[in-house]
Amino acid sequence: MEIAYTKTTLANGLDVILHEDHTLPIVAVNVWYHVGSKDERPGLTGFAHLFEHLMFEGSAHHDHGYFPPLQDAGAAGNGATIPERSNTWEVVRTGALELALFL
């Protein structure tokens, strides 16, 4: 099975991979960071996973946590850390895409 997509690199170096499927009125956003547990030093482990969880606590632009606004929008989201990467993801109604990208 082949899935059609486009890939663009923004001026800030962020790679954007886009696949469009208009079957349902939802959007999935998945942000990958090219850092994971393999980047940790022996004896100093767990930081990649810690930072993944800290992403859910808010930011300078949004200090109310990650999950409440997604839940209010009827969305689902989570994150993961593996040796090669850390990521966060959201699945939202198309009308909540800006929220998912903002968080």
Predicted regions and their residues:
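N- or domain-start disorder-to-order transition segments that initiate the globular core
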Residues: 1-25
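Short amphipathic alpha-helices in soluble, non-transmembrane regions
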Residues: 101-103
